[in-house]
């Protein structure tokens, strides 16, 4: 892809910086090198996880699979084996959809967990857990706290928009449509019940 592993690692570090991962530095492609120059933080892992599921949401289709029978085909024939997900939250935490477990002797047991409830998707990132059970327990605690503080307000009743008048156009006016439904997530534990709606536009009444 990049010609050499080092060139690819350089791209990785550039991309990490673009995502705001200020406390991350890669030294290889696999992430298994036990070096003081190879580091990251739970916050940065959460940023990377968010980018992944935002740009490629289909990854959750695969990371949410608990167990799957795989057929390995070679020239000598085929064999079957069962692949089991290492993310135990898939079976124990409601709404869990992934995402990635990992461990090394330095990083200990790590997890980036993704869960969705009531239209809200949260990410819990855990690092340096002493054992697998602790990483899953801590991730569940973080997710529970997040869901207890977050409430989704979704406005389905969109008011009709007035057409936009045109100047020197092929038509006198064109219809306007909403880019999408209005969504707001309260993160302080309160429910956004009393919401006042106001339509605002950043363009003139007459478009050129």
Describe each region flagged by the PLM:
Residues 21, 25, 36-208:
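Domain-terminus/edge residues, biased toward the C-terminal soluble/receptor-binding domains
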């Amino acid at each position: 892809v990049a010609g050499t592993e080092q060139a690819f690692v350089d791209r990785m570090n550039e991309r990490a910086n673009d995502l705001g991962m200020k406390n991350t530095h890669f030294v290889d492609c696999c992430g298994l090198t036990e070096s003081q120059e190879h580091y990251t933080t739970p916050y940065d892992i959460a940023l990377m996880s968010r980018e992944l599921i935002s740009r490629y949401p289909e990854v959750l289709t695969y990371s949410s699979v608990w167990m799957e029978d795989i057929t390995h085909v070679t020239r000598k024939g085929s064999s079957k084996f069962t692949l089991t997900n290492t993310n135990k939250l898939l079976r124990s935490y409601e709404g869990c959809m992934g995402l990635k477990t990992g461990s090394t002797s330095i990083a200990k047991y790590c997890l980036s967990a993704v869960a969705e409830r009531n239209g809200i998707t949260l990410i819990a990132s855990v690092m340096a857990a002493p054992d697998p059970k602790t990483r899953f327990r801590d991730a569940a605690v973080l997710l529970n706290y997040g869901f207890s503080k977050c409430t989704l307000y979704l406005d389905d009743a969109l008011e009709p928009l007035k057409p936009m008048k045109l100047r020197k156009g092929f038509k006198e006016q064109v219809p306007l449509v909403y880019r999408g439904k209005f969504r707001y997530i309260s993160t302080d534990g309160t429910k956004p019940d009393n919401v006042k709606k106001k339509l605002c536009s950043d363009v003139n009444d007459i478009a050129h």
